[in-house]
């Protein structure tokens, strides 16, 4: 065919011709692609075949191993006497509520086969028994925590009891405070008691007559009611009554009433009344003295306070006057600096302020 005739050929026919030529003479790229596809297909088939062969080999080895084990067991059964030991142990707990049993199987070697080694014991357990430690773990941890808590609690209680046993404070501040308070209170009480308080002791004779016992009891009760009165709340003076088993003691001036033979409270009512009146008078006089002494103390204290206040006020006024005079001068200096000129008398007194003019200073030095 001529090349000019090809234009008259339809397009479908031209494509068919090209495809035929391509199949007869393929290009380099097409051949490469074909080879790559073929290699992939071959590799996939090879890998699948290899997997199959491996799986078959494994199965064959397993079967052979099982056969060998069965054969060996059959030999051992012929030579060994089977002895079965079953040991069942059941354990139950309240917290988890389970029971387990385990059985141990042993094979004892017979005397007729000394060369065969003893097989290892095979232990078979139930699944519930394997779960038991997991159930016991929280209980054991709870027990440990409870034990540690009890230990710490006991230690804390011991420390608290030891602190309670200690009566005195650890620091010496409390001791010093009590010591100082006892000194000041003791000194004040002794001064007041030496000036004011007098002790009156009265007794009831044990061997007195039956008629005088009633009078003695009434006298002692009356003396209690009289002597228990306090003159005033500001003075805070206490009156004490002591009962001795021998005599009635009042003061040094009342020695004429001390009868050694306990005949003070006789059957005579006049003596009893006279004693009662003297006691009342003595108590009243002492109360008056206490009141007067307290008033004098208050007056003296007030006077001292007034004098101190007046002196302080006067000192303040003098200081204010001196400050006003010193501030009025224009030029000020201390006259202690004039000691070199010959004014030594100003050293003995407080510093005096004057002017700084030399003429006035010369006149002062003359």
From Swiss-Prot:
Coiled coil: none
Segments for region (Disordered): 42-73, 129-148
Localisation per UniProt entry: Cell membrane
Natural source organism: Arabidopsis thaliana
Main localization of the protein described in the UniProt heading: membrane
Family recorded in the similarity comment: Belongs to the BIG GRAIN 1 (BG1) plant protein family.
Positions with biased composition (Basic and acidic residues): 56-73
PANTHER family: PROTEIN BIG GRAIN 1-LIKE A-RELATED, PROTEIN BIG GRAIN 1-LIKE B-RELATED
GO cellular component: plasma membrane
Protein name (Swiss-Prot/TrEMBL): Protein BIG GRAIN 1-like B
Keywords of the record: Auxin signaling pathway, Cell membrane, Membrane, Transport
Annotated function: Involved in auxin transport. Regulator of the auxin signaling pathway.
Keyword Transport: yes
UniProt-listed GO biological process terms: auxin transport; auxin-activated signaling pathway; positive regulation of auxin mediated signaling pathway
């Amino acid at each position: 065919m001529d090349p000019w005739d090809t234009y008259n050929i339809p397009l479908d026919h031209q494509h068919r011709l090209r495809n035929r030529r391509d199949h007869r003479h393929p290009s380099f790229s097409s051949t490469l692609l074909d080879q790559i596809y073929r290699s992939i297909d071959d590799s996939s088939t090879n890998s699948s075949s290899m997997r199959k062969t491996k799986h078959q080999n494994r199965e064959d080895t397993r079967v052979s191993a099982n056969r060998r084990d069965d054969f060996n067991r059959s030999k051992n059964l012929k030579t060994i006497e089977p002895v079965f030991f079953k040991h069942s142990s059941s354990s139950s707990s309240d917290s988890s509520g389970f029971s387990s049993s385990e059985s141990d199987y042993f094979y004892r070697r017979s005397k007729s086969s000394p060369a065969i080694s003893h097989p290892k014991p095979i232990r078979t357990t139930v699944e519930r028994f394997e779960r038991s430690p997991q159930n016991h773990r929280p209980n054991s941890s709870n027990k440990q925590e409870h034990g540690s808590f009890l230990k710490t609690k006991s230690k804390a209680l011991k420390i608290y009891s030891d602190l309670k046993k200690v009566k005195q404070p650890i620091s010496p501040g409390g001791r010093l405070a009590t010591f100082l308070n006892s000194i000041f209170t003791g000194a004040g009480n002794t001064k007041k008691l030496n000036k004011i308080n007098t002790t009156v002791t009265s007794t009831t004779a044990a061997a007195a007559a039956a008629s005088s016992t009633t009078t003695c009891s009434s006298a002692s009760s009356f003396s209690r009611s009289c002597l228990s009165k306090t003159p005033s709340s500001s003075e805070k003076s206490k009156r004490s009554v002591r009962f001795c088993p021998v005599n009635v003691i009042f003061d040094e001036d009342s020695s004429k009433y001390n009868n050694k033979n306990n005949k003070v409270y006789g059957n005579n009512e006049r003596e009893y009344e006279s004693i009662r009146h003297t006691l009342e008078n003595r108590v009243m006089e002492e109360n008056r003295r206490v009141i007067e002494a307290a008033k004098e103390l208050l007056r003296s204290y007030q006077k001292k306070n007034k004098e101190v206040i007046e002196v302080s006020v006067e000192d303040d006024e003098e200081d204010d006057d001196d400050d006003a005079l010193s501030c009025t001068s224009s030029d000020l200096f201390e006259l202690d600096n004039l000691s070199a000129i010959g004014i030594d008398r100003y050293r003995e007194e407080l510093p005096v302020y004057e002017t700084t003019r030399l003429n006035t200073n010369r006149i002062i030095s003359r």
